[in-house]
Regions:
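Soluble catalytic domains of membrane acyltransferases
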Residues: 3-197, 206, 304-305, 321-439
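Membrane-proximal, non-transmembrane alpha-helical segments
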Residues: 263-342
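Long, charge-rich alpha-helical interaction segments
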Residues: 197, 204, 208-298
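Short, well-structured alpha-helical interface segments that form or flank functional binding sites
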Residues: 137, 201, 314, 318
Length: 439
């Protein structure tokens, strides 16, 4: 492993830990060095490799789009185990360039390292729970590595799926699912007889495995419909409205089964499905016009929001949140404004803010902590502990901000007559129970 990767890894792990409220890994790889090519879904751009790298035991090298490798960034990306992959739209001889990259991949696999590849090649502008058609690169690289070693070493391919409740929302949740690996050595005879066919067949097999690790909606235009059913039922992967009695894994499985059920209506759509879709659309449009969130309406309907407990939490967190604001708020505002102005595609915002935050907040606070430690005549280790605690103070600030926002929203909603919306929601709950199977 390169030294910068080793140094940055614990900081990135902390950043991911702070960003997501809960992370669950299913079938996590057992070994750090196992010559495996991980084929992952690309739902959230730069966030995907960050969360996989920090929640996977394996030492990973990342295949990254070549246009981010500039004169300035190339040394840093190299140090972070990133390798460029060239696409036709990059305006270069992709075959020649990728041959060089494939050789580096072969060298990494020969050294018992692992690769993380995103065969879809791109990320949707808007977060959608689906897998786009994948390319053959992962399988091709695996067989190139096997030929280079004269088939003496085992090379594996495994599907990995990142399931976000919402990737750009801090304190949301994430479930990472890993498939059992495919050993490419088992296909030597077929490969030597007809390499093109075997690569195509195995790519299809990997695509099926990748879909099994995530929620996959065939019809892109039904993504909103799928999300709305999850919100009303409370059983799915929505990050705001969900039943807390269901574990994240159960909610993920519900999301998958719901999508698979909707995918069965590829040709003829039953009248009751179209009717439900229309009713949901009307309900959420009225919520939007009223500037009300469904989670708040549900809390009011169920009388589940306790303003007193929320106020106690705010008071308890206030001293720590104040320290968090003093140490982090100004850099945070700079990062937020810079990222949202620089990157037009919002899919990049969450990961870029997280990475920039890790570096800029550290650079901003190191001299402050050093001066404080010296001024108060404290030993180095006290300053170090305080520096680490700054991230917890910032988390307190984020938590108190969310609680205050909820308090303001709930105070506002209490003044509204929401009877009509409550009745609409109750009717939708009943309709979903009647129409959607009990998964």
């Amino acid at each position: 492993m390169r030294i910068l990767y080793v140094i940055v890894y614990p900081f990135m792990s902390l950043a991911v830990f702070l960003f997501y409220r809960k992370i669950v890994s299913i079938n996590k790889p057992k070994y750090r060095f196992n010559r495996t090519i991980y084929a992952g879904n690309h739902a959230a751009s730069f966030m995907d490799p960050l969360v996989v790298a920090t929640n996977n035991r394996s030492v990973l090298y990342f295949m990254t789009r070549s246009d981010v490798f500039t004169t300035f960034s190339k040394p840093f990306l190299w140090a972070f185990h990133m390798l460029p992959i060239y696409r036709q739209q990059d305006g270069v001889d992709t075959k020649e360039k990728n041959a060089e990259v494939f050789q580096k991949c072969t060298d990494a696999l020969a050294a018992k390292k692992n690769l993380l590849i995103y065969p879809e090649g791109l990320t949707d502008d808007v977060f959608i729970r689906r897998l786009k058609p994948i390319k053959k690169g992962a399988i091709r690289i695996g067989f190139i590595a096997l030929e280079a070693s004269n088939w003496k070493e085992k090379v594996y391919v495994s599907a990995i799926g990142c399931n976000y409740t919402y990737p750009n929302a801090m304190r949301s949740e994430l479930l990472i699912s890993n498939s059992d690996p495919i050993c490419l050595n088992d296909y030597r005879t077929e490969y030597e007889a007809n390499s093109y066919q075997v690569i195509a067949d195995l790519t299809d097999k990997v695509e099926v495995l990748m879909k099994a690790q995530i929620t996959h909606i065939e019809r892109e235009e039904w993504s909103e419909f799928h999300e709305q059913i999850m919100i009303i039922s409370g059983k799915g992967m929505n990050y705001l409205t969900y039943d807390k009695s269901f574990s994240l894994e159960l909610r993920w499985k519900y999301s998958q089964k719901l999508a698979n059920w909707l995918n069965t209506f590829s040709e003829t759509i039953p009248v009751e499905i179209e009717s439900l879709k229309s009713q949901l659309s009307t309900y959420f449009e009225q919520l939007k016009n009223s500037e009300i969130l469904d989670c708040d309406l549900k809390a009011k309907k169920d009388n589940s929001y306790n303003s007193f407990l929320n106020l106690i939490s705010i008071i308890a967190l206030f001293p720590f949140a104040t320290l968090g604001a003093l140490h982090c708020y100004l850099p945070y505002r700079f990062i937020k404004n810079f990222v949202e102005k620089k990157f037009k595609r919002s899919v990049f915002w969450g990961s870029t803010k997280m990475v920039l935050g890790m570096f800029i907040l550290s650079l901003f606070n190191v001299p402050i902590v050093a001066v404080l430690t010296n001024y108060l005549d404290q030993p180095f280790w006290i300053g170090l502990i305080y520096f680490v605690l700054i991230s917890m103070f910032w988390l307190s600030f984020v938590s108190i901000k969310l609680k205050i926002n909820q308090f303001v929203r709930m105070s506002k909603i209490k003044r509204f007559n929401t009877n009509e919306l409550v009745i609409m929601r109750q009717e939708l709950e009943e309709r979903i129970l009647q129409i959607v199977p009990k998964f």
